[in-house]
Amino acid sequence: MVLLARADRSLLNDAVTVLAACLMTLVVAAAGTHGGTRSPPDLPGLTWLPGADRARPWLLTALLLAYFAGTVLYVKTMIRDRGDGRRYALSVAYHVVVCLPAAVVNPWLGLLFVALALRSAVVPKWWPGITPAAIGAGEIAASITLGALLLLT
C-alpha cells in the first residue's frame, strides 16, 4: 500500500519503538524483584503494573524515554529531515523542555540534557553535513553518559 511506504522510517513508528524499548525497564525491574507486582489495596487479587509500588523503575523509564525520544528527533533532523526547519524547531523545543524535569531529578542529568539541547540546536546549523557515523558516535557517547548517571541516580 502506497500510504505505508517507508512507514518503518516514520516519526510515529520510531516513537512507538522507543516507548516499547523503554517500557522494558519496568519488565526488568519486575523480574529482578521476583515479579515485583502486588494487588492494589482496593482491588485484591489483581496483578498491578510492574513496579507500581516503587517509583525508581518508573523514574528510570521516564528518563530513558525522554532521552531516546529526543534522539529520534535529533537524528531525523540530522539525516532524513536535514534542512526541515519545522523538524529542527521541534527537536530543539523538545530538548529544551526536558532539561528542567531532568535537572529536578539530578543536577548532573540536567547538565547532560542541557548539553543535548545545545547539541540539537548547534550541530544541525554549524555542521549540517556531518556523517551518520559521527552522529552515531555522539549518540553512543551520550547513551553511555546517561547510563552512568542513571546508575548513580
Placement of each model-derived feature along the sequence:
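Interhelical loop and helix-boundary elements at the membrane-water interface
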Residues: 1-19, 78-92, 121-141
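Small-residue-rich segments of transmembrane alpha-helices in multi-pass membrane proteins
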Residues: 16-30, 87-102, 137-153
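Active-site rim beta-loop-alpha module in soluble metabolic enzymes
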Residues: 63-101
